[in-house]
């Protein structure tokens, strides 16, 4: 058996298409792009070669986050399995440098085809350090979003007056959510759809609230390690003013 037969090859990217630099940055059929929490900014291609485990040509459509690679590859390499790695990290045993938590989940069974379901049911979307949206299974809850234009990620996020929610499998291109006129018209059309579907969407709103409450409460024991940098003009000018001095 050669070395390649004992090696997992992963080809992916860290974000959706950077359509602000089209055509070099790529394009996507999904809404938004890099620097946004729309699906166009979060969905990324993923190719995996794992001889003897993943059959060539296999297509998987369940949730898989880049965060999941750490516990998954550690498991495959012979390290702690399942939640064991997370427990070690939270107790400060591993890597022994800092006490924190692990947001990834072990996806070994899903990748190997021993489970048809992903081990991940929830994914949190952040705009910088600001909670933006959350996905639970096929449902995505929207709270604070940037414009879905190519340059939307360069501007501040807008907090919606009410939570928007959509079945992302039913509307993968997010046509019925957003603040632009086209989205609002589509949203109105969805209200006119079978009332059972519309009412069901709104009846599960507490799920998103409970998920975010649990996520934010975890900051008490495991606070963010550092604040993200700001790239908006106001923040840059303020930093320049604070670092300089007035002429005498």
Label each region the model flagged:
Residues 47-56:
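The feature captures the short pre-catalytic strand/loop hairpin that immediately precedes
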Residues 1-6, 78-88, 116-118, 214-235:
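Surface-exposed helix-capping loop/turn segments at secondary-structure junctions
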Residues 17-39, 55-58, 62, 67-175:
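C-terminal cap/loop subdomain of S1 sulfatases and analogous C-terminal strand-loop tails that border
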Residues 141, 147-148, 155-164, 168-248:
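Long, internal low-complexity/basic segments
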Residues 1-22:
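Metal-dependent active-site segment of extracytoplasmic phospho-/sulfohydrolases and closely related
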Residues 8-13, 46-47, 69, 73-74:
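Beta-strand elements within well-structured catalytic alpha/beta cores of enzymes
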Residues 3, 66-69, 73, 103, ...:
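Stable alpha-helical elements in mature extracytoplasmic
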């Amino acid at each position: 058996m050669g070395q390649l037969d004992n090696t997992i090859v992963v080809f992916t990217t860290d974000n959706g298409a950077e359509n602000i630099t089209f055509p070099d940055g790529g394009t996507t059929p999904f809404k938004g792009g890099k620097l946004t929490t729309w699906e166009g900014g979060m969905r990324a291609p993923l190719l995996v070669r794992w001889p003897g485990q993943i059959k060539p040509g296999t297509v998987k459509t369940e949730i898989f986050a880049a965060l999941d690679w750490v516990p998954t590859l550690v498991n495959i390499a012979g390290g702690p399995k399942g939640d064991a790695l997370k427990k070690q990290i939270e107790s400060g045993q591993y890597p022994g440098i800092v006490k924190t938590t692990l947001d990834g989940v072990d996806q070994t069974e899903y990748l190997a085809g021993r489970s048809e379901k992903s081990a991940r049911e929830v994914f949190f979307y952040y705009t910088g350090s600001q909670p933006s949206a959350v996905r639970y299974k096929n449902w995505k809850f929207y709270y604070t979003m940037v414009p879905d234009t190519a340059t939307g990620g360069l501007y501040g996020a807008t907090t919606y007056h009410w939570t928007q929610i959509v079945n992302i499998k039913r509307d993968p291109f997010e046509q019925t959510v957003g603040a632009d006129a086209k989205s609002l018209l589509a949203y109105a059309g969805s209200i006119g759809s079978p009332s059972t579907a519309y009412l069901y969407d709104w009846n599960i709103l507490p799920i998103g609230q409970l998920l975010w409450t649990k996520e934010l409460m975890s900051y008490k024991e495991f606070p963010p390690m550092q604040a993200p940098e700001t790239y908006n003009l106001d923040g840059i000018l303020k930093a320049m003013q604070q670092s300089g001095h007035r002429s005498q």
